[in-house]
Amino acid sequence: MPNAPKRRDVLKYAGATGAAATAFGLPLAQPAAAAEPETFRVRGRAPLDTVVFGDADSEAAHHLDATLSDVVTGGLGQPARVLNPSTPATYWGGTLKFDVTVRPTGTTYVTVRLWGDDHDDTSEEAGSGTNMWRLQLFCEGKQVGYEDQGAVDSLDILDTAPRTPGRFFFHTLPLPERMTAGRNKVTLEIRSMGRIWSYGQDASQLYRTMTTPSRGIYRLYTHTDPYFEAPRGEVQGTAPTATVRTGGEEVMDAIRARVQKDQKNLLTTATPATMDGWAMQSLAEGYLWPGSPAHQDPQAVERVLMAIDGRYMAWQADATVLTGSDQQWQGFGRVGLVLALLWEHLGDRLDGQVTGSPYAIANPGFESGGATPTAWQMPGWATAGGGTWARDTTVRRSGTASLKLQVTSASGYSYVNSAPRTRITPGTYRYGAWIRTDGVTGAGAHIDPLFFDASGKLVGSDHKVYASKGTHDWEYVEFVFATPTGATQLELHLRLSGPGTAWFDDITLVAPTDTTVPVPPPRRDAYVDMLRSSRDYWRRHFPHYSNQAQICAIGLYQTNRGLRLLAPELALPEDRARDYLYQSIGMVPYLGPEDQDGNPTRPLGADYYQVTRAGLTRELGYVGSYGEVIDWLVMMYESVTRGYQGQEAPELRDHMVMMTKARGRFRVVDVDKDHHRISRIETVIGWRNEVYPGETAYASRTAWDSNPVMSAAVFKDPEIVGWTQEMVADGQLYPQLNLQATHPWTRVGLNALRFLSRDWDGFQSLAARPARIPTAWDQPDFVLTDEQNGCVAVKNGEELFFASLYFRSRQGVNNYARIHHVTPVDQRSATIREHSAGTTDSTFTARDWVLWDYAINDPGASHLPPGGFPPPGDTLHQALAGDVYRLAPVPDDVPDPTLGVHFDGVETMLVGRAPFYLCEYGDYLIAMNTSTDRTCVLPARLDFGPARDLVTGKMIGAGKRPRLGPLSTLVLYRGDAG
């Protein structure tokens, strides 16, 4: 593939390049395609141009051409324009086209002014809003940047939470230098568009129709300094006074009700064979929790094992149950975990056969179930008959229950069928049932097997066999029939047509005598097969993205733990099993998938760590929500410590606490839509699927597997406990629990159960701690630098400064930095130009793509075209196409930074992170050395002037040229230099 970075093309950082950097200081490499090198500028230059939308004079002066647009009065009484949906509605909405002044040399920036209270109110915060519209910038008819997850991104992405309540905020993007070179004016365009679902598997799933007006667009500025400073006199707004949120306690009652309902359903009604891993674990946890109806109920243990049986049978029929199920990279890990939790309560159950043979009718005696029996259902179309069905424990032929059907009207009926379908083979089968009746008239009670082919098509029906009418005791009815041609599966229907009551029990299915039906193995053997196969498969497919690696490592440890109980001779030694955990969280180098002999392949060399020295995950750089892996850390820790023969793991806990605390430096404390104090995840500088503002988070956040108090309850670290107690004091606990109360997914049900049964009580028992979120204005200043992720977090008085110097740089060094600057008054987000050095002579050329600037690094994603599916409508072209990015050097022992995935433009490891960065934004200058073996010397900074080193507090003169050793960063601030 042309211009795609491959291992043989990536030169090593050594020799003359390194010597030049060491001897002569950090070169100021010009940005890709820039007309001339940048020089450092003095902060405070006025904008080149300002367009005031909704102001007739300004719009006329800039030759505004508006389509599908209205002028509105918006925040603080300021004029703005909204862009309306088209008729009929499509992905694209209204547009604003206008002329602006630019600089003919260097980089011209565009900044848009937006009102911070605007948000999509169609969903709860952090939910999937339907009106999360976007604004995209175009220059001279070409799209500037990418519609989703590009370094140069959309002009705006609306979220379900307001970004800066009561104030305006600013977003800055660079115009391509080639489009402004030699020109004083260009034509820009803002196009509105619908929502994008980044995980869509085709264009219709990706691109959603815009159906309501966009947010208000207030002003657009052009300027030459990366830091935008609004002209004096512009109305900005002030931060609302933060208050404490009150109320919301009723969500706790909703969670209690939900958990009780879930537990009762799992114990009595749900079909065990079709339970997923979360349901399986939920029932096991319920058996151990005194608050559950399943507590110490032997039926719960049996149903958990039946769920494992069902997973085993499903895997025997479909190998992807292991390799591509809803458990993803965890494989059959929960099977091992559940066995460890229940080990002392299993008795001799593991000696029995696996239940749920696909060749047998499940629950033939209706022994399992609650109000209705498991593995039986009334089809939706049958509800029109007006009849009822129930599991009756007062009438039975044998065992403890039967199926009761009842009809009251002459034309009524009640039909029930077995589910799932039962496999059959050619030959003559005997189908039977015992039926008892009371006052039955009309057609009466009967059985009726329905036959289907492998695709689910009905190929045989109307084989009714009736019991006697009237009132009588148990009567056996039987149907002997040769399997219809093409039939491979059946549903056995039990029916009552006409008034009366009928009971069914002891359903029989007898296969032909000359048919060999597979006999299920003993549970112990089946479970060993499951656990060993899962462990060994995922050892050979240990993924490289950090969150995937963590999930996989959890599964590897859990399956091995199950083997340690079932077949100790097949289990890996504890230190070997725990090593996967260590690799996944950066305690030791990540060694990658293993070969058939168990030898690590080291695809990223011998010294790649999944978590940085600063405690952040790598995907490839800093990520916001994706980096909040505390739920996986807790799951990993408890996979070792809970259950039979659980072990202490202080080394894991200490490292996980460090990682959790690192995330605490990436928080923004502000107010929510109701002006209540809140802490949010820093997402502006993140690489993947970010929303602005970030989700609520103090220590732990709410997610599918996470609740807000879990890390405090489990780790009990004083700082983490203090942050979590701060969340409760702010009144922000209850709003985060709506997910656990309302979402029906079994995964969330397990989350709700752990919150109610363990985390909430455990958290409440902890002593009060004084620690508070580090980024609050009343907390001490700090500087966190992460050279491996190329990012910094700074608290400097009443300023927060977040920067990603290695930002969405997927195939080469793009020389874009991402900035988020926060004060009590305003917020700025920006993609700006920066300088880098130490790159190789190999290059990657940006493609003419508009959705993504990359291809997904996953061999299973070949159905997704590189760059993503084009949006609907006319063909668009990328203004950045043709930009040339130099590749960073990679270590000698990395055989292929694409990891064997050679799609055009594939996201590639390591080649986008430059050895050296120099970035200026406002009063901040960052010099970062990401190399492991080189020292660089900073150039003189006469235009920037003297500045304070925010780590040491020392002043550094403009002419001083400090040296930066390997993996070190200098953060200079000139705002108080005199």
Predicted features by range, described:
Residues 102-127, 427-437:
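A short beta-strand element within beta-rich, extracytoplasmic domains
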Residues 356-518:
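Extracellular and organelle-lumenal recognition/adhesion modules and their flexible linkers in secreted
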Residues 68-92, 390-411:
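Short carbohydrate-recognition loop motifs
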Residues 2-3, 9-30:
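N-terminal export signals
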Residues 144-177, 457-486:
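Extracellular carbohydrate recognition and processing domains
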Residues 313-345, 353-355, 522-772, 782, ...:
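Extracellular polysaccharide-recognition and catalytic grooves
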Residues 37-71, 225, 233, 356-384, ...:
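Extracellular carbohydrate-recognition regions
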Residues 97, 644-946:
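Extended polysaccharide-engagement surfaces of secreted carbohydrate-active enzymes
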